[in-house]
Amino acid sequence: MEEAAHVKAELRLGTAGWNVPRVWKERVGGVGSQLERYARVLNATEINSSFHKPHRRSTYEKWANATPDDFRFSVKVPKSVTHSSQLAQGELDRFVEESAGLGAKLGVLLVQFAPRKMFVESDAEFLFRALQERTSAALACEPRHVSWFTSEVGAWLRERRIARVAADPARVPDADLPGGWPGLRYFRLHGAPRIYYSAYDGAFLRSLKVRLGAASSSSETWCIFDNTAAGAAIENALDLLA
């Protein structure tokens, strides 16, 4: 596969999934599958479906083979692992083995916690250590409880090389700012004011572009648009490239 040429190497830009609505197919044209066409324009994607159901290793291998050498995937850790009161080690082992089918194109494992999941050091230590013992992929977490957004927890994440997602809209103060390990900056844009549906306007995208430029000058930086419900994600990602 030829390498994606439209995005600077230090910035990973994409959407959650790679569905391209018909209205945007002229901007993401050419031959091939939706993923092949998508990957000619954007250099990253986030696989969210893994949160709800497993995929075969052969499916991950197929996705990897459909993309350029420089393309990278972020994969969301299953909710059976992140939303359980006890770590489901069998589920985690299966997920890691399956997603390893992406090979070198596996860039990040994304851990999203339930909104009521408080920071409990022993629980967090157990989960993140289990992940890091099984994979060399970078880790990003998206907590949604206020207890995760303290300087002490930020330092705890930094020490363990775990990035904290910058999520918009912010559920709690500072949730829209990247935190934790500074070697990875991961932005997730869910859509505002209507989450998953609303497109971001030009003023927001211009401001975001400045933030991404500053972040990517010193860190691997990901920007994933998750406002996919009405097709706004691909529009916003393409406009950010313009």
Please report, for each region that a protein language model flagged, where it lies by residue.
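Residues lining hydrophobic/aromatic ligand-binding pockets adjacent to catalytic sites
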Residues: M1-A242
